[in-house]
Amino acid sequence: MHVVLAGGGTAGHIEPALALADALRRQDPTVGITALGTERGLETRLVPERGYELALIPAVPLPRKPTPELITVPGRLRGTIKATEQILERTKADAVAGFGGYVALPAYLAAKRLGVPIVVHEANARPGLANKIGSRYAAQVAVSTPDSKLRNSRYIGIPLRRSIATLDRAAARPEARAMFGLDPNLPTLLVTGGSQGARRLNEVIQQVAPWLQQAGIQILHAVGPKNELPQVHQMPGMPPYIPVSYLDRMDLAYAAADMMLCRAGAMTVAELSAVGLPAAYVPLPIGNGEQRLNAQPVVKAGGGLLVDDAELTPEWLQQNVLPVLADPHRLYEMSRAAAEFGRRDADDLLVGMVYEAIAARARR
Protein backbone atom coordinates (compact mmCIF):
# COMPACT_ATOMS: atom_id res chain seq x y z
CA MET A 1 0.00 0.00 0.00
CA HIS A 2 1.20 3.53 -0.79
CA VAL A 3 -0.32 6.76 0.53
CA VAL A 4 0.52 10.22 -0.82
CA LEU A 5 0.21 13.10 1.64
CA ALA A 6 -0.65 16.63 0.49
CA GLY A 7 -0.23 19.23 3.21
CA GLY A 8 2.68 21.57 2.63
CA GLY A 9 3.51 25.18 3.33
CA THR A 10 3.05 25.74 7.05
CA ALA A 11 3.47 23.61 10.15
CA GLY A 12 -0.31 23.64 10.58
CA HIS A 13 -0.66 21.64 7.36
CA ILE A 14 2.48 19.53 7.68
CA GLU A 15 2.35 18.29 11.28
CA PRO A 16 -1.07 16.58 10.97
CA ALA A 17 0.12 14.93 7.74
CA LEU A 18 3.25 13.61 9.45
CA ALA A 19 1.20 12.43 12.43
CA LEU A 20 -0.92 10.41 9.99
CA ALA A 21 2.25 9.05 8.37
CA ASP A 22 3.56 7.92 11.75
CA ALA A 23 0.23 6.26 12.59
CA LEU A 24 0.13 4.45 9.23
CA ARG A 25 3.65 3.13 9.82
CA ARG A 26 2.77 1.99 13.35
CA GLN A 27 -0.06 -0.12 11.97
CA ASP A 28 1.88 -1.34 8.92
CA PRO A 29 5.66 -0.77 8.80
CA THR A 30 5.69 -1.72 5.10
CA VAL A 31 3.33 1.04 3.93
CA GLY A 32 4.86 3.42 1.40
CA ILE A 33 4.50 7.14 2.12
CA THR A 34 5.31 10.11 -0.10
CA ALA A 35 4.69 13.71 0.95
CA LEU A 36 4.07 16.35 -1.69
CA GLY A 37 5.63 19.77 -1.19
CA THR A 38 7.09 22.87 -2.77
CA GLU A 39 10.66 24.06 -2.59
CA ARG A 40 9.76 27.03 -0.38
CA GLY A 41 7.64 25.27 2.23
CA LEU A 42 8.63 24.07 5.69
CA GLU A 43 8.15 20.52 4.42
CA THR A 44 11.59 20.66 2.78
CA ARG A 45 13.01 20.39 6.30
CA LEU A 46 10.27 18.69 8.34
CA VAL A 47 9.47 15.76 6.04
CA PRO A 48 13.05 14.44 5.56
CA GLU A 49 13.72 14.91 9.29
CA ARG A 50 10.91 12.45 10.00
CA GLY A 51 12.26 9.94 7.49
CA TYR A 52 9.68 10.22 4.71
CA GLU A 53 10.06 10.75 0.97
CA LEU A 54 9.39 14.29 -0.26
CA ALA A 55 8.30 14.90 -3.85
CA LEU A 56 8.37 18.54 -4.98
CA ILE A 57 5.79 20.12 -7.28
CA PRO A 58 5.53 23.74 -8.54
CA ALA A 59 3.81 26.07 -6.08
CA VAL A 60 0.51 27.64 -7.16
CA PRO A 61 -0.63 30.03 -4.40
CA LEU A 62 -4.39 30.55 -4.28
CA PRO A 63 -5.45 34.16 -3.55
CA ARG A 64 -7.87 34.45 -0.63
CA LYS A 65 -9.80 37.17 -2.51
CA PRO A 66 -10.39 37.96 -6.21
CA THR A 67 -7.28 39.66 -7.59
CA PRO A 68 -5.73 40.08 -11.07
CA GLU A 69 -3.40 37.20 -10.14
CA LEU A 70 -6.41 34.87 -10.00
CA ILE A 71 -6.59 34.91 -13.81
CA THR A 72 -3.20 33.20 -14.06
CA VAL A 73 -4.03 30.38 -11.64
CA PRO A 74 -5.69 27.91 -14.08
CA GLY A 75 -2.73 27.92 -16.48
CA ARG A 76 -0.15 27.44 -13.74
CA LEU A 77 -2.33 24.84 -12.03
CA ARG A 78 -2.44 22.63 -15.14
CA GLY A 79 1.31 22.11 -15.06
CA THR A 80 1.29 21.34 -11.35
CA ILE A 81 -1.57 18.84 -11.74
CA LYS A 82 0.39 17.05 -14.48
CA ALA A 83 3.48 16.87 -12.27
CA THR A 84 1.36 15.50 -9.42
CA GLU A 85 -0.23 12.88 -11.69
CA GLN A 86 3.25 11.63 -12.57
CA ILE A 87 4.07 11.23 -8.86
CA LEU A 88 0.82 9.35 -8.20
CA GLU A 89 1.53 7.03 -11.12
CA ARG A 90 5.18 6.49 -10.11
CA THR A 91 4.27 5.60 -6.53
CA LYS A 92 1.18 3.57 -7.56
CA ALA A 93 -0.72 5.56 -4.95
CA ASP A 94 -3.63 3.79 -3.27
CA ALA A 95 -4.91 6.99 -1.64
CA VAL A 96 -4.25 10.72 -1.36
CA ALA A 97 -4.66 12.27 2.08
CA GLY A 98 -4.87 16.06 1.87
CA PHE A 99 -4.60 18.66 4.62
CA GLY A 100 -5.00 21.93 2.74
CA GLY A 101 -2.38 24.40 1.60
CA TYR A 102 -0.71 25.03 -1.76
CA VAL A 103 -0.09 21.39 -2.65
CA ALA A 104 -3.51 20.04 -1.70
CA LEU A 105 -5.61 21.34 -4.60
CA PRO A 106 -3.42 19.95 -7.41
CA ALA A 107 -3.22 16.68 -5.48
CA TYR A 108 -7.02 16.45 -5.26
CA LEU A 109 -7.50 17.24 -8.94
CA ALA A 110 -4.77 14.82 -10.04
CA ALA A 111 -6.21 12.06 -7.84
CA LYS A 112 -9.70 12.67 -9.25
CA ARG A 113 -8.39 12.33 -12.81
CA LEU A 114 -6.64 9.05 -12.00
CA GLY A 115 -9.41 7.60 -9.84
CA VAL A 116 -7.28 7.54 -6.69
CA PRO A 117 -9.39 7.76 -3.49
CA ILE A 118 -9.17 11.09 -1.67
CA VAL A 119 -9.28 11.66 2.08
CA VAL A 120 -9.52 15.28 3.24
CA HIS A 121 -8.63 16.56 6.69
CA GLU A 122 -9.53 20.15 7.60
CA ALA A 123 -7.80 21.49 10.71
CA ASN A 124 -9.39 24.95 10.84
CA ALA A 125 -12.92 25.76 11.93
CA ARG A 126 -13.33 27.72 8.68
CA PRO A 127 -12.23 25.54 5.73
CA GLY A 128 -9.76 26.81 3.16
CA LEU A 129 -10.44 26.89 -0.58
CA ALA A 130 -8.42 23.76 -1.41
CA ASN A 131 -10.29 21.60 1.08
CA LYS A 132 -13.66 23.04 0.09
CA ILE A 133 -12.98 21.84 -3.45
CA GLY A 134 -11.35 18.58 -2.39
CA SER A 135 -14.26 17.61 -0.15
CA ARG A 136 -16.53 17.47 -3.22
CA TYR A 137 -14.51 14.58 -4.62
CA ALA A 138 -13.42 12.92 -1.38
CA ALA A 139 -14.33 9.44 -0.24
CA GLN A 140 -13.79 10.54 3.37
CA VAL A 141 -13.76 14.01 5.00
CA ALA A 142 -12.42 14.55 8.52
CA VAL A 143 -12.72 17.79 10.50
CA SER A 144 -11.31 19.16 13.72
CA THR A 145 -14.39 20.94 15.08
CA PRO A 146 -17.84 19.48 15.79
CA ASP A 147 -19.70 22.22 13.89
CA SER A 148 -17.73 22.17 10.62
CA LYS A 149 -19.56 23.25 7.48
CA LEU A 150 -17.84 20.72 5.18
CA ARG A 151 -20.32 18.28 3.70
CA ASN A 152 -20.43 14.64 4.85
CA SER A 153 -17.64 15.29 7.33
CA ARG A 154 -16.66 13.32 10.43
CA TYR A 155 -15.39 15.05 13.55
CA ILE A 156 -12.14 13.43 14.73
CA GLY A 157 -9.90 16.29 15.92
CA ILE A 158 -6.37 16.86 14.59
CA PRO A 159 -3.71 14.13 14.33
CA LEU A 160 -0.97 14.98 16.84
CA ARG A 161 2.63 13.96 17.42
CA ARG A 162 2.83 10.97 19.76
CA SER A 163 4.98 12.95 22.19
CA ILE A 164 1.97 15.25 22.63
CA ALA A 165 -0.89 12.77 22.28
CA THR A 166 0.56 10.47 24.94
CA LEU A 167 1.81 13.20 27.29
CA ASP A 168 1.10 12.81 31.01
CA ARG A 169 1.71 16.38 32.17
CA ALA A 170 1.73 15.60 35.88
CA ALA A 171 4.20 12.74 35.53
CA ALA A 172 6.53 14.74 33.27
CA ARG A 173 6.39 17.97 35.29
CA PRO A 174 9.40 17.42 37.60
CA GLU A 175 11.69 16.62 34.64
CA ALA A 176 10.24 19.48 32.59
CA ARG A 177 10.66 22.17 35.22
CA ALA A 178 14.17 21.02 36.04
CA MET A 179 15.15 21.12 32.35
CA PHE A 180 13.96 24.72 31.93
CA GLY A 181 15.39 25.93 35.24
CA LEU A 182 11.98 26.56 36.79
CA ASP A 183 10.96 26.26 40.42
CA PRO A 184 9.30 22.85 40.95
CA ASN A 185 6.38 24.26 42.94
CA LEU A 186 5.43 27.72 41.63
CA PRO A 187 2.52 28.44 39.25
CA THR A 188 3.94 28.67 35.74
CA LEU A 189 2.85 30.67 32.69
CA LEU A 190 4.10 29.53 29.29
CA VAL A 191 4.15 32.20 26.57
CA THR A 192 4.73 31.59 22.87
CA GLY A 193 3.51 33.04 19.60
CA GLY A 194 4.22 29.87 17.63
CA SER A 195 7.28 28.91 15.61
CA GLN A 196 7.89 32.52 14.51
CA GLY A 197 7.02 34.20 17.80
CA ALA A 198 4.51 37.05 18.10
CA ARG A 199 5.75 40.58 18.62
CA ARG A 200 2.67 41.85 20.44
CA LEU A 201 2.63 38.93 22.88
CA ASN A 202 6.34 39.47 23.49
CA GLU A 203 5.90 43.17 24.21
CA VAL A 204 2.97 42.73 26.58
CA ILE A 205 4.47 39.87 28.57
CA GLN A 206 7.71 41.77 29.06
CA GLN A 207 5.71 44.69 30.47
CA VAL A 208 3.65 42.55 32.83
CA ALA A 209 6.38 40.08 33.87
CA PRO A 210 7.49 42.01 37.00
CA TRP A 211 3.90 42.15 38.30
CA LEU A 212 3.42 38.42 37.69
CA GLN A 213 6.70 37.62 39.42
CA GLN A 214 5.74 39.74 42.42
CA ALA A 215 2.52 37.72 42.60
CA GLY A 216 4.51 34.48 42.76
CA ILE A 217 4.17 33.45 39.10
CA GLN A 218 7.14 32.16 37.09
CA ILE A 219 7.29 32.57 33.31
CA LEU A 220 8.75 30.49 30.47
CA HIS A 221 8.73 32.69 27.36
CA ALA A 222 9.58 31.55 23.82
CA VAL A 223 10.15 34.81 21.96
CA GLY A 224 10.68 33.25 18.51
CA PRO A 225 13.97 32.69 16.66
CA LYS A 226 13.66 35.94 14.69
CA ASN A 227 13.25 38.10 17.79
CA GLU A 228 15.90 39.33 20.21
CA LEU A 229 15.98 37.85 23.68
CA PRO A 230 15.00 40.46 26.28
CA GLN A 231 17.49 41.54 28.92
CA VAL A 232 16.53 39.93 32.21
CA HIS A 233 17.62 41.30 35.57
CA GLN A 234 16.59 38.55 37.96
CA MET A 235 15.96 39.87 41.48
CA PRO A 236 17.01 37.56 44.34
CA GLY A 237 14.09 35.65 45.79
CA MET A 238 11.78 36.42 42.85
CA PRO A 239 10.19 33.69 40.70
CA PRO A 240 12.18 33.20 37.49
CA TYR A 241 11.37 34.78 34.14
CA ILE A 242 13.09 32.60 31.53
CA PRO A 243 13.12 33.81 27.91
CA VAL A 244 14.29 31.41 25.18
CA SER A 245 14.45 31.76 21.41
CA TYR A 246 12.69 28.51 20.59
CA LEU A 247 11.29 25.43 22.32
CA ASP A 248 12.44 22.16 20.78
CA ARG A 249 10.52 20.09 23.34
CA MET A 250 6.98 21.43 23.33
CA ASP A 251 5.83 18.34 25.20
CA LEU A 252 8.03 19.26 28.16
CA ALA A 253 7.06 22.94 27.87
CA TYR A 254 3.40 21.91 28.15
CA ALA A 255 4.24 19.67 31.11
CA ALA A 256 6.06 22.50 32.89
CA ALA A 257 3.18 24.96 32.49
CA ASP A 258 -0.05 25.54 34.40
CA MET A 259 -1.42 27.95 31.79
CA MET A 260 -0.39 29.32 28.40
CA LEU A 261 -0.61 32.66 26.61
CA CYS A 262 -0.61 32.03 22.85
CA ARG A 263 -2.14 32.50 19.42
CA ALA A 264 -5.05 30.29 18.36
CA GLY A 265 -3.76 28.30 15.41
CA ALA A 266 -5.67 25.06 14.91
CA MET A 267 -2.68 22.90 15.89
CA THR A 268 -2.01 24.90 19.04
CA VAL A 269 -5.63 24.67 20.18
CA ALA A 270 -5.72 20.94 19.45
CA GLU A 271 -2.49 20.21 21.32
CA LEU A 272 -3.41 22.24 24.39
CA SER A 273 -6.86 20.68 24.54
CA ALA A 274 -5.47 17.17 24.18
CA VAL A 275 -3.02 17.60 27.06
CA GLY A 276 -5.47 19.56 29.22
CA LEU A 277 -3.49 22.81 29.38
CA PRO A 278 -5.73 25.88 29.77
CA ALA A 279 -4.77 28.93 27.75
CA ALA A 280 -5.46 32.59 27.16
CA TYR A 281 -5.90 32.60 23.37
CA VAL A 282 -5.05 35.74 21.37
CA PRO A 283 -6.24 35.13 17.79
CA LEU A 284 -4.00 36.49 15.05
CA PRO A 285 -5.87 39.53 13.66
CA ILE A 286 -5.38 38.65 9.98
CA GLY A 287 -6.78 36.14 7.49
CA ASN A 288 -10.45 35.22 7.52
CA GLY A 289 -10.90 35.09 11.29
CA GLU A 290 -10.28 31.35 11.54
CA GLN A 291 -8.12 31.62 14.67
CA ARG A 292 -10.99 33.04 16.73
CA LEU A 293 -13.24 30.26 15.45
CA ASN A 294 -10.56 27.68 16.32
CA ALA A 295 -10.48 28.76 19.97
CA GLN A 296 -14.17 29.42 20.59
CA PRO A 297 -15.29 25.80 21.20
CA VAL A 298 -12.73 25.01 23.92
CA VAL A 299 -13.23 28.44 25.51
CA LYS A 300 -16.99 27.84 25.53
CA ALA A 301 -16.33 24.46 27.17
CA GLY A 302 -14.45 26.24 29.97
CA GLY A 303 -10.92 25.27 28.92
CA GLY A 304 -9.55 28.71 28.12
CA LEU A 305 -9.91 32.47 27.82
CA LEU A 306 -10.22 34.50 24.62
CA VAL A 307 -9.03 38.07 24.01
CA ASP A 308 -8.69 40.10 20.83
CA ASP A 309 -5.18 41.18 19.88
CA ALA A 310 -6.09 44.86 20.31
CA GLU A 311 -7.46 44.17 23.80
CA LEU A 312 -4.36 42.34 25.05
CA THR A 313 -2.75 44.67 27.60
CA PRO A 314 -0.80 44.26 30.83
CA GLU A 315 -3.99 45.27 32.65
CA TRP A 316 -6.00 42.54 30.93
CA LEU A 317 -3.44 39.93 31.97
CA GLN A 318 -3.49 41.19 35.54
CA GLN A 319 -7.28 41.11 35.69
CA ASN A 320 -7.88 37.81 33.86
CA VAL A 321 -4.81 35.55 33.81
CA LEU A 322 -3.32 36.29 37.21
CA PRO A 323 -6.49 35.26 39.11
CA VAL A 324 -6.51 31.91 37.30
CA LEU A 325 -2.87 31.17 38.05
CA ALA A 326 -3.41 32.13 41.69
CA ASP A 327 -6.36 29.74 42.09
CA PRO A 328 -5.40 26.01 42.01
CA HIS A 329 -9.06 24.91 41.96
CA ARG A 330 -9.87 27.08 38.95
CA LEU A 331 -6.75 25.85 37.17
CA TYR A 332 -7.85 22.27 37.82
CA GLU A 333 -11.37 22.89 36.50
CA MET A 334 -10.11 24.63 33.36
CA SER A 335 -7.58 21.87 32.75
CA ARG A 336 -10.27 19.22 33.09
CA ALA A 337 -12.59 21.11 30.72
CA ALA A 338 -9.84 21.43 28.10
CA ALA A 339 -8.96 17.73 28.37
CA GLU A 340 -12.60 16.66 28.04
CA PHE A 341 -12.89 18.73 24.87
CA GLY A 342 -9.58 17.53 23.40
CA ARG A 343 -8.99 14.49 21.19
CA ARG A 344 -5.87 12.31 21.44
CA ASP A 345 -6.78 9.58 18.95
CA ALA A 346 -7.33 11.53 15.72
CA ASP A 347 -4.30 9.95 14.05
CA ASP A 348 -5.64 6.41 14.45
CA LEU A 349 -9.15 7.49 13.45
CA LEU A 350 -7.78 9.07 10.27
CA VAL A 351 -5.85 5.89 9.46
CA GLY A 352 -9.17 4.06 9.63
CA MET A 353 -10.71 6.53 7.20
CA VAL A 354 -7.82 6.02 4.75
CA TYR A 355 -8.36 2.26 4.89
CA GLU A 356 -12.11 2.73 4.41
CA ALA A 357 -11.52 4.88 1.32
CA ILE A 358 -9.17 2.29 -0.20
CA ALA A 359 -11.56 -0.57 0.60
CA ALA A 360 -14.51 1.27 -0.95
CA ARG A 361 -12.59 1.70 -4.19
CA ALA A 362 -11.67 -2.00 -4.22
CA ARG A 363 -15.36 -2.95 -3.92
CA ARG A 364 -16.34 -0.91 -6.97
Curated annotation (Swiss-Prot):
Pathway where this protein functions: Cell wall biogenesis; peptidoglycan biosynthesis
Binding locations of UDP-N-acetyl-alpha-D-glucosamine: 10-12, 124, 161, 195, 291
Locations listed in the record: Cell membrane
GO annotation terms (biological process): carbohydrate metabolic process; cell division; cell wall organization; lipid glycosylation; peptidoglycan biosynthetic process; regulation of cell shape
Membrane topology: Peripheral membrane protein
Main location: membrane
Pfam families, sorted: Glyco_tran_28_C, Glyco_transf_28
Keywords: Cell cycle, Cell division, Cell membrane, Cell shape, Cell wall biogenesis/degradation, Glycosyltransferase, Membrane, Peptidoglycan synthesis, Transferase
InterPro entries: GlcNAc_MurG, Glyco_trans_28_C, GlycoTrans_28_N
GO cellular component, one term: plasma membrane
GO molecular function, one term: UDP-N-acetyl-D-glucosamine:N-acetylmuramoyl-L-alanyl-D-glutamyl-meso-2,6-diaminopimelyl-D-alanyl-D-alanine-diphosphoundecaprenol 4-beta-N-acetylglucosaminlytransferase activity
Gene3D superfamilies attached to this UniProt entry: Glycogen Phosphorylase B
Substrates-to-products reaction catalysed: di-trans,octa-cis-undecaprenyl diphospho-N-acetyl-alpha-D-muramoyl-L-alanyl-D-glutamyl-meso-2,6-diaminopimeloyl-D-alanyl-D-alanine + UDP-N-acetyl-alpha-D-glucosamine = di-trans,octa-cis-undecaprenyl diphospho-[N-acetyl-alpha-D-glucosaminyl-(1->4)]-N-acetyl-alpha-D-muramoyl-L-alanyl-D-glutamyl-meso-2,6-diaminopimeloyl-D-alanyl-D-alanine + UDP + H(+)
EC number(s) from the headed UniProt entry: 2.4.1.227
NCBIfam families named among the record's database cross-references: murG
Family: Belongs to the glycosyltransferase 28 family. MurG subfamily.
UniProt function note: Cell wall formation. Catalyzes the transfer of a GlcNAc subunit on undecaprenyl-pyrophosphoryl-MurNAc-pentapeptide (lipid intermediate I) to form undecaprenyl-pyrophosphoryl-MurNAc-(pentapeptide)GlcNAc (lipid intermediate II).
Stated name of the protein: UDP-N-acetylglucosamine--N-acetylmuramyl-(pentapeptide) pyrophosphoryl-undecaprenol N-acetylglucosamine transferase
Lineage of origin: Bacteria, Bacillati, Actinomycetota, Actinomycetes, Kitasatosporales
